[in-house]
């Protein structure tokens, strides 16, 4: 069965949002510190699909063990979903990634 790993579940500006004084953004609870939305689907054969690659991608990937990415699925072209594409280079060194 494929495994879904959420790398980020925040808004397009992340959580906390800069300058926001709401209860969530001022919370000290680690669950209220969320990077922008992204996920990885890992299949039983080891293949991995990255869903969106926002500006938090580098930090997200440093938080999990390194493994190849076989395909990038972009849900739409907003910066919070594509802003980390340049950080895919370590994953595409001497191999290609389908987009």
Regions found by a protein language model. Give the residues of each.
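Active-site metal-binding motif and surrounding structural segment of the metallo-beta-lactamase
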Residues: 46-99
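Conserved beta-strand hairpin/beta-sheet module of binuclear metal-dependent hydrolase folds
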Residues: 2-63
